[in-house]
């Protein structure tokens, strides 16, 4: 997966999809009460990016619904994964709980109500910290409560705090989440990968490859914009690379030394199926 980073308005969304990105990551802000409000990152953000792009969350959901619906004039077949990077820090536990319910309600309203089941996009609900686990809990409960339990097949989960892998697994076990888990490791592109290192990324890949007992479906690295970093990630066996330059990542993927092992994912590929590094 070539995952376009910080896709927070429609102009940049079109640009990245034109480049060939098959996944987008969007920052979602919340009110103090936990109501999803807008796609917005703000400053500081990645180097060489405009931090203040924004659009309302409802408009964002309507647009991505159109883009992922076959037969719609705006349909883009390469839009497979939508990573919702949830800006939850500072919210109370009650607000987090409400936020999980409201996100489920909004996804259902824009994508799946009224008998609509043909949208092709899959979501990853990306929570910053394991201490905010109640958000995932109430999201899953609300999906069942509103009759959308079957649509959990289109939803995955991720914690982005670069935390201890065993602690993260224990939280997933507590929540009863045993599949559809995307695991990530990374750092802003303003900091050289040399300073971050890849030991935790390698640990995630090892855990993914351990067998049926593992809890990880996919592993992605962020935010990789340099060729050396992208090549290293591919050699380690990641499933996705989040980047500010999707076309650049795809061009590396298509080089002979990598295309024999990798290809860009399509709709026929299950975003939650586990593939081992070879």
From Swiss-Prot:
Cite the EC number. Answer: 4.6.1.-
Binding annotation for Mg(2+): 25, 27, 85
MF terms in GO: lyase activity; metal ion binding; phosphoric diester hydrolase activity; toxin activity
The keyword Secreted appears for this protein: yes
A single GO CC term, please? extracellular region
Name which cysteines form disulfide bonds: 45-51, 47-190
Which residues carry out catalysis? 5, 41
Q: Where, per UniProt, does this protein localize?
A: Secreted
Q: What class of enzyme is it?
A: lyase
The family database entries (CDD domains) matched by this protein are listed as:
GDPD_like_SMaseD_PLD (cd08576)
Q: Which superkingdom, per the lineage?
A: Eukaryota
Q: Which GO terms describe its biological process?
A: killing of cells of another organism; lipid catabolic process
Q: What is its main location?
A: secreted
In terms of InterPro entries, this protein maps to:
PLC-like_Pdiesterase_TIM-brl
Question: What reaction is this protein's catalytic activity?
Answer: an N-(acyl)-sphingosylphosphocholine = an N-(acyl)-sphingosyl-1,3-cyclic phosphate + choline; an N-(acyl)-sphingosylphosphoethanolamine = an N-(acyl)-sphingosyl-1,3-cyclic phosphate + ethanolamine; a 1-acyl-sn-glycero-3-phosphocholine = a 1-acyl-sn-glycero-2,3-cyclic phosphate + choline; a 1-acyl-sn-glycero-3-phosphoethanolamine = a 1-acyl-sn-glycero-2,3-cyclic phosphate + ethanolamine
Q: Does the keyword Lyase apply?
A: yes
Residues annotated as transmembrane: none
Known tissue expression? Expressed by the venom gland.
Task: Kindly state which keywords UniProt assigns to this record, in alphabetical order.
Answer: Cytolysis, Dermonecrotic toxin, Disulfide bond, Hemolysis, Lipid degradation, Lipid metabolism, Lyase, Magnesium, Metal-binding, Secreted, Toxin
Cofactor(s) the protein needs: Mg(2+)
Q: How is the cofactor bound?
A: Binds 1 Mg(2+) ion per subunit.
Instruction: Give the family this protein belongs to, as stated in its UniProt record.
Output: Belongs to the arthropod phospholipase D family. Class II subfamily.
**So what does this one do?**
Dermonecrotic toxins cleave the phosphodiester linkage between the phosphate and headgroup of certain phospholipids (sphingolipid and lysolipid substrates), forming an alcohol (often choline) and a cyclic phosphate. This toxin acts on sphingomyelin (SM). It may also act on ceramide phosphoethanolamine (CPE), lysophosphatidylcholine (LPC) and lysophosphatidylethanolamine (LPE), but not on lysophosphatidylserine (LPS), and lysophosphatidylglycerol (LPG). It acts by transphosphatidylation, releasing exclusively cyclic phosphate products as second products.
Protein known as: Dermonecrotic toxin LspiSicTox-betaIE2i
UniProt organism field: Loxosceles spinulosa (Recluse spider)
């Amino acid at each position: 997966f070539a995952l376009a980073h910080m896709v927070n308005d429609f102009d940049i969304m079109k640009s990245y999809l034109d480049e060939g990105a098959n996944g987008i990551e969007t920052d979602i802000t919340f009110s103090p009460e936990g109501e999803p409000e807008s796609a917005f990152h703000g400053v500081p953000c990645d180097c060489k990016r405009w931090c203040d792009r924004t659009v309302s969350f409802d408009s964002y959901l309507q647009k991505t619904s159109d883009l992922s619906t076959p037969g719609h004039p705006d349909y883009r077949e390469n839009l497979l994964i939508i990573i919702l990077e949830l800006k939850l820090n500072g919210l109370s536990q009650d607000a987090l709980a409400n936020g999980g319910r409201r996100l489920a309600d909004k996804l259902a309203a824009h994508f799946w109500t009224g008998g609509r089941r043909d949208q092709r996009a899959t979501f990853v609900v990306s929570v910053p910290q394991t201490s905010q686990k109640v958000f995932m809990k109430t999201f899953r409960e609300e999906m069942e409560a509103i009759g959308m339990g079957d649509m959990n097949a289109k939803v995955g989960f991720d914690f982005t705090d670069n935390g201890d892998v065993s602690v993260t697994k224990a939280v997933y076990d507590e929540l009863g989440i045993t599949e559809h888990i995307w695991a990530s490791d990374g750092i802003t592109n303003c900091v050289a990968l040399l300073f971050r290192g890849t030991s935790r990324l390698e640990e995630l890949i090892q855990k993914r490859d351990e067998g049926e007992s593992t809890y990880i479906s996919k592993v992605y690295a962020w935010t990789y914009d340099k060729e050396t970093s992208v090549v290293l990630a591919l050699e380690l066996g990641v499933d996705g690379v989040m980047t500010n330059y999707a076309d650049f990542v795809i061009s590396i993927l298509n080089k002979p030394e990598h295309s024999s092992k990798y290809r860009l994912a399509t709709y026929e590929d299950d975003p939650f199926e586990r593939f081992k590094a070879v």
